[in-house]
Amino acid sequence: MNKRRILTFVMVVVLVGGLAAACAAPAPAPAPAPAPAPAPAPAQPAEVFEWEYQTLHPVGSATYAGFHLKLADLVKEMSGGRLILRVHPGNEIVPVYEQTEAVRDGVLDMAHSDLGAEMALVGKSALLLGASGYPAGTTCDEDFSWFYLGDGMDYASQVFEDYGLVIGCLPEGQEVFCYSHKPLATAADWDGVKMRTIGLWAEVLGTFGASVVTISGGEVYQSAEKGVIDAFEYAGPTVNWPMGFHEIMDYMGLPGIHSPGATHTIKVNRQSWSNLPADLQQILVVAIESLGNEFRTSLLINDSASLELYRDYGTNIFYVSDDFQAEIAKRTKEITLQYAADDPLFNEIWENKKAFVKTYKGGKTATTLNYSIYD
């Protein structure tokens, strides 16, 4: 009897509990999982700037491959492909001696030009800015130092203010005095000679009875081969050898008193420059300076080997007499002082550069050794 009551009681409790559970409020639903974060927007591709860059040099020149093409490769690598220089040899887009106007007009974004051919644009001050063809003038090392450590870059940008911005220079070394069909070692040898040259040397040479022709480097070989000119100068031994001048001229003159250094400026269009982000501007400036210094050093090393190529080929090498060199320097100084008297800006640049070179030479002279076990 007791067992039945206990069993009945248990069943009643279970039944009542079940009914209570059924009547209770439902348990709250679990909170929904948070929505996944939206996927990040795809990164926008970096803007790529493509520039047209024309040089002075033809394709066969050592400078074309050794500096200009290397500059394009270096800038592309340093910029991660954001700045592309499309390199063009001289005359491909515009005539060589119209490159500066083309930079001003936006036809070219950048150009490498010889200041010795640009007096008609900006006056005689251009000659002091490292121009090829300034007899007994500054060397490439002096010009390069003045540009980057002195006031050369600022003066260059001032002189060419209406045409673009000067952002660097390329030192190309001392030039060969000339290529010719006969020795031209004395003043008397030059009377009546048709000579291709540029710069102040053209004016000085005229005082010795020569007639001067100004043509681009890419036209020199053909003009000499056809007899349009009797003699010409272009660059140094390393740059000249691939041009094949030894094939058509029997004589080569040394030293290059007419052009101890040829330091060419690199100009950019102002709008193209302002469109570049600051980091790309810096990359281009640094690349030009670094590669310019490297190229200059390579010329110092290779010029000696290139002279041996001329000797092995059979080119007759003559040396300009000391008397003729002294007379060239004397007449150049007279013309320079007259330019300075007539032109205030020329005089300012002349005095500035003269003071810098004096300091440069003073330090170099004081530390130069007279003896070396490598001599």
Feature annotation, model-predicted:
Residues 1-50, 368-375:
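Short, low-complexity disordered leader/linker segments with a strong preference
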Residues 24-26, 43-143, 155-375:
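N-terminal secretory/targeting leader peptides
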Residues 150-151:
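Core domains of carbohydrate- and sulfate-ester-processing enzymes
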